[in-house]
């Protein structure tokens, strides 16, 4: 099952690229048409920027994501308990030893990043290390190592990178629309536009408004099932379902993280780092803890 999931994740990587670059292209077309005088020129520029940003994030994802979350790298001497658990789980999973980081935050959470098992990293908060016992910590780290082994991290990294690029470009475009201006404003230009240009303009303007939401929904579409698989894979590594269940129950009672967590990188964490409520729950990247626990009990 795991090998099939790895193959599916690789296919999803290309599907994600197509969807996100389509959104980038549509937003870029609107910006280019209205402010650069060339819709297709804006589309090409947006795609080039998005491609460079995505490639940079993929190959620099570990350093970028760790810096965004204020993580510091540790080793066997500075954090022996965490280091040894990561080492053990990586050995069982038969992947290279990931780099190990700690985030100074009293909440309980952990995440992994990196484009492949060869350049991955695992991070845990000080709150998690203070509360979890050895079996629970193994469950959490096993979950993160499973993300690495199943190539979930590559999908998440691409989603984080391109969702951030789309959101940034869409926000810039909306600000430009709000303040007015632009080079493509006169009637002569508009009267000379072809029907295809008008249709693309309308679609791109809609994309400018909806792109951040669409990018979030794409992340949601792949994130929740990925969490279920990582929970099950962690139990496969530890042979201790109760340890994973106990860890999830403790995570469910954890407070939100105190430091700011970027919306795009929130999906990387084992538990929702913001603990939002109300309608915002509709956009959770993680399934409810209670549902995750029930699935583990059925194993």
Swiss-Prot record:
What Gene3D superfamilies does its record include? Metalloproteases ('zincins'), catalytic domain
Active-site residues, record numbering mapped to chain: 144
> Where, in this chain's numbering, is Zn(2+) bound?
143, 147, 227
Question: Out of the domains of life, which is the source?
Answer: Bacteria
Cofactor(s) in the UniProt record = Zn(2+)
- As recorded in UniProt, its EC number(s) are 3.4.24.-
What organism does the UniProt record list as the source?
Streptococcus thermophilus (strain CNRZ 1066)
The record ties this protein, via HAMAP family, to: Pept_M48_protease_HtpX
Q: What topology does the record note for this protein and the membrane?
A: Multi-pass membrane protein
Q: Where does the UniProt annotation locate this protein?
A: Cell membrane
The keyword Hydrolase is annotated on this UniProt entry: yes
Q: Which PANTHER family does this UniProt record tie to the protein?
A: PROTEASE HTPX (PTHR43221:SF1)
Give me the Gene Ontology terms describing cellular component: plasma membrane
Q: Which UniProt keywords apply?
A: Cell membrane, Hydrolase, Membrane, Metal-binding, Metalloprotease, Protease, Transmembrane, Transmembrane helix, Zinc
Q: Name one GO molecular function term.
A: metalloendopeptidase activity
Q: Which Pfam families match?
A: Peptidase_M48
Q: What is this protein called?
A: Protease HtpX homolog
Record-stated family: Belongs to the peptidase M48B family.
- Please give the InterPro entries that the UniProt record associates with this protein: HtpX_protease, Pept_M48_protease_HtpX, Peptidase_M48
Q: Which residues cross the membrane?
A: 14-34, 39-59, 153-173, 198-218
BP-aspect Gene Ontology terms: proteolysis
């Amino acid at each position: 099952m795991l090998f099939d999931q790895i193959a599916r994740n690789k296919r999803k990587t290309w599907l994600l690229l197509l969807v996100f670059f389509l959104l980038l292209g549509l937003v870029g077309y609107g910006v280019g048409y209205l402010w650069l005088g060339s819709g297709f020129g804006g589309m090409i520029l947006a795609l080039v920027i998005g491609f460079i940003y995505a490639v940079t994030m993929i190959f620099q994802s570990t350093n970028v994501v760790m810096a965004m979350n204020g993580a510091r790298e540790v080793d066997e001497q500075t954090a022996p308990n965490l280091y040894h658990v990561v080492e053990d789980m990586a050995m069982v999973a038969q992947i290279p030893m990931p780099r190990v980081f700690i985030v100074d935050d009293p909440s309980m959470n952990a995440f992994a990043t990196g484009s492949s098992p060869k350049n991955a990293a695992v991070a845990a908060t000080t709150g998690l290390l203070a509360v979890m016992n050895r079996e629970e910590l193994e469950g959490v780290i096993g979950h993160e190592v499973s993300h690495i082994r199943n190539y979930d991290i590559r999908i998440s990294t691409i989603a984080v990178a391109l969702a951030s690029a789309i959101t940034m470009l869409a926000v810039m475009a909306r600000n430009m629309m709000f303040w007015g201006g632009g080079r493509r404003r006169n009637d002569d230009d508009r009267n000379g536009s072809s029907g295809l240009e008008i249709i693309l303009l309308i679609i791109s303007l809609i994309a400018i408004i909806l792109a951040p939401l669409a990018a979030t929904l794409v992340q949601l579409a792949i994130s929740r099932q990925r969490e279920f698989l990582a929970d099950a894979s962690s139990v496969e590594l530890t042979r201790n379902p109760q340890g994973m269940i106990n860890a999830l129950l403790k995570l469910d009672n954890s407070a939100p993280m105190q430091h700011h967590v970027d919306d795009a990188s929130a999906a990387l964490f084992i538990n929702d780092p913001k603990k939002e409520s109300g309608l915002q729950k509709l956009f959770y990247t993680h399934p409810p803890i209670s549902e995750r626990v029930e699935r583990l009990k059925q194993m």
